[in-house]
Swiss-Prot record:
Main location: secreted
Oligomeric and partner information: Interacts with bacterial lipopolysaccharide (LPS) and lipoteichoic acid (LTA). In vitro interacts with phospholipid bilayers.
PROSITE patterns associated with the record: RNASE_PANCREATIC
Chain positions with 3'-nitrotyrosine modification: Y60
Keywords assigned: Disulfide bond, Endonuclease, Glycoprotein, Hydrolase, Nitration, Nuclease, Secreted, Signal
Gene3D superfamilies associated with the record: Ribonuclease A-like domain (3.10.130.10)
Described function: Cytotoxin and helminthotoxin with low-efficiency ribonuclease activity. Possesses a wide variety of biological activities. Exhibits antibacterial activity.
Compartments, record wording: Secreted
Cysteine pairs bridged by disulfides in the record: C50-C110, C64-C123, C82-C138, C89-C98
Protein name: Eosinophil cationic protein
């Protein structure tokens, strides 16, 4: 049986709609600049256990984020990494605005262990501490960002 064109178009629209919803779930809350949202998601000098640390992110996103990495360093240190040599981003090879840290930093990687959680208050995470290099994508600052840093980290691409 061959699907009719109309049915195929409806299915395609539904699929694209679902992909759009999934994409919007990962979107930055509009009240934050890219750098501010990066700091909320990835900078925490002394993060508590993952289940507690992830509550802030999950409250903004209204969902249980599958995984996240907290760099146990300062925003200033991470912004200075943006001065390092520019490289192609390892995870997103189409981007050429990444920079690798020169030193390993302590970090805390969080993995969601109950992906079927119906409520963000019940999200539970496994903690994986470590010490690694990291790669960030950087961009010129938004006018709402501090003028102290002309180029700011906006995306944690990977840890090495």
């Amino acid at each position: 049986m061959v699907p009719k064109l109309f049915t195929s178009q409806i299915c395609l629209l539904l699929l694209l709609g679902l992909m759009g919803v999934e994409g919007s779930l990962h979107a930055r809350p509009p009240q934050f600049t890219k750098a501010q949202w990066f700091a909320i998601q990835h900078i925490n000098v002394n993060p508590p256990r993952c289940t507690i640390a992830m509550r802030v992110i999950n409250n903004y996103q209204r969902r249980c984020k599958n995984q996240n990495t907290f760099l146990r360093t300062t925003f200033a240190y991470t912004a200075n990494v943006c001065r390092n040599e520019r490289i192609r981003c390892p995870r997103n090879r189409t981007l050429h605005n990444c920079h690798r840290s020169r030193y390993r930093v302590p970090l805390l990687h969080c993995d969601l262990i109950n992906p079927g959680a119906q409520n963000i208050s019940t999200c539970r995470y496994a903690d994986r501490p470590g010490r690694r290099f990291y790669v960030v994508a950087c961009e010129s600052r938004d006018p709402r960002d501090s003028p102290r840093y002309p180029v700011v980290p906006v995306h944690l691409d990977t840890t090495i």
